[in-house]
Amino acid sequence: GDVYKRQIISSMQKGNIGVTTENIFPVIKKFLYSDHEIFLRELVSNAVDATQKLKTLASIGEFKGEVGDLTVHVSLGKDTITVSDRGIGLTAEEIDKYINQIAFSGANDFLEKYKNDANAIIGHFGLGFYSAFMVAKKVEIITKSHKEGAQAVKWSCDGSPEFTIENIDKADRGTDIVPVSYTHLRAHETCADL
């Protein structure tokens, strides 16, 4: 047990999200999202986007694997909602770039910078993704890139600028996004109400 635990710890990295201008959480909470349900729309829209990108790569011959079932699933747990896709997935480097750096640079710079860039492979994934923190104490991304030999990773963050990322086993490509412990729901709401 202990040896296994040690291995896990040694492959886990902690870091701070690169906050270059203002931290994006207050921006998101205040301006972008007055509507709680929007986070679910955002996460599903990210999942659909990742799926479309995989289809595109397959159609131009850049993805040669089995495309298979591309349904986006939303499943409810007691304290979680999981949005799962079998799209392009993310590598640790992409998480670092799109989640840790871009999404936390000022929202305005970010929107300015990417609004005309159709080629940003993961587009504005980060911004919509962070809307999940409006309702959850912690958010996890469990993902495996479509790239051959890619290592699956799990990223988690509790809404502070600190995150952890670790290597995990995941058989299939794609991404699960799991907002955990819904702190910000109104008293009478449960995950199911969303």
Task: Report residues per predicted region.
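Conserved small/polar residues in nucleotide/adenosyl-binding loops
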Residues: 1-7, 183-190
